[in-house]
Amino acid sequence: MKTAIVTGGTSGIGLGVAKMLLGKGYYVYTTYVGADFTEKIENFEPIKVDQTNREELYRFIAHIKEKCSSIDCIVCNAGMTIRKSFTETTDYDWDCMMEVAVNSHYILVRELYSLIPAGSRIIFTGSQMGLMPHAMVLSYGVTKAAVHALAKNLVKEFEGTGTTVNAIVPGFVETPWQKEKPEEIKQNIYRKTAIHRFASVEEVVDAYRFCIENPFVNGSLIEVNGGYSYK
């Protein structure tokens, strides 16, 4: 049985990707924070890990090294948003967002490098906000731009192995977090999206499936945004 890791895999896009991998026969380890994940899913092992905390991250890595002889797929999906203006964002806010989206995933792939066999898949969750600016999420956009750069640069570390590294770049998606937006804000986003709605989780998960199934897609930022533009 192949083994996969999905960070932030108990809700939204992460859970959708995890279930897709389960359907492909993977055993899936996932990290999460917040309330305990109590749903029982076969071959799915959720582990509570605060990815802003290096000690917790390294404990998770040690657990993976103890349990697994190889890791065939890593989906670096976890991210963090703190909605504050540019001048209100503190050093701590900035550090936490960078730690979750960028630093923890750099460490995860680096520490598990020797367990990643030829022909594996590494996929990052980026964001449209990492390509174009957006009000009130400057720091989030910067973290996602760094995620995009990390994905593209990691390609060279796996050159000649058949292992591919890509990033999926979603626009606005019908996740629990997005559903909490005020209706006025959602309608404004709909107007800026050529298809006039948010993506479903399943539509975004299809892009991850494509990266897993196609061995020649490598170093790509794959946008799934419904034709979103800042008009």
Regions found by a protein language model. Name each.
Residues 109, 143, 151:
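Active-site helix of classical SDR
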Residues 77-82, 227:
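Conserved NAD(P)H cofactor-binding loop of Rossmann-fold oxidoreductase domains
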Residues 10-11:
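Conserved glycine-rich cofactor-binding loop
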Residues 127:
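Residue(s) in the substrate-gating loop at a strand-loop-helix junction
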Residues 197-224, 229:
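C-terminal substrate-recognition "lid" of short-chain dehydrogenase/reductases
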Residues 114, 156-160:
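Alpha-helical segment proximal to the catalytic Tyr-Lys
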Residues 85-86, 90-95, 178, 189:
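Substrate-binding pocket helix/loop in short-chain dehydrogenase/reductase
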